[in-house]
Amino acid sequence: MKNQTMKSHTMKNRLTPSHQIDLGSGDGRIVREAALRLYQATGVELNWPLVLYSRLTCSRLNCIHRPKFLRTDLLRHSLSTYDVVVIFGVKSLMKPLQAKLAAELHPDACVVACRYRLPDWRHVDQIIEGVDSVWLYRPPAAAAAAARTGGAARAWS
């Protein structure tokens, strides 16, 4: 798990988000790291003890943008205001989640998927190492436009 977190951070170092969400935030380590880097960060998790643990752990941080942890269904939470979406989901969730991402994300947004790929999206970058694999995506409409113009996304450097 620690190896997965490090790979996700490596991928995110290629991004310059202003507002990040971690879907399936678990113990909150990705959200904490984002908050320490001065990003606005939100974690969404169904497991109430993990939400409480994350809130307690982050309450000790001295961050400009205090991280938020929400106990809610990630398929019901609006993603329209986020620049970067981090997903540590289960395989069966990836297909319904990609439809939600396509419908709600703005064109400059980025998606970092950990462990499981989005089945119908084309990744723009990847770190492949077995179960610790990470993929970087852009919403399909934005990726198609960039391919036509040869442009790069504004959301990463």
Where are the regions that the model predicts?
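C-terminal substrate-binding/active-site "lid" region of AdoMet-derived donor-dependent transferases
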Residues: 92-157
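S-adenosyl-L-methionine
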Residues: 1, 14-17, 52-80
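Conserved SAM-binding motif I beta-strand of class I
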Residues: 40-45
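Conserved short alpha-helix immediately C-terminal to the canonical SAM/SAH-binding motif I
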Residues: 48-50
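Conserved SAM-binding loop of SAM-dependent methyltransferases across substrates and taxa
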Residues: 27-39
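A short SAM/SAH-binding and catalytic strip from SAM-dependent methyltransferases
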Residues: 80-96
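Conserved class I S-adenosyl-L-methionine
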Residues: 19-26
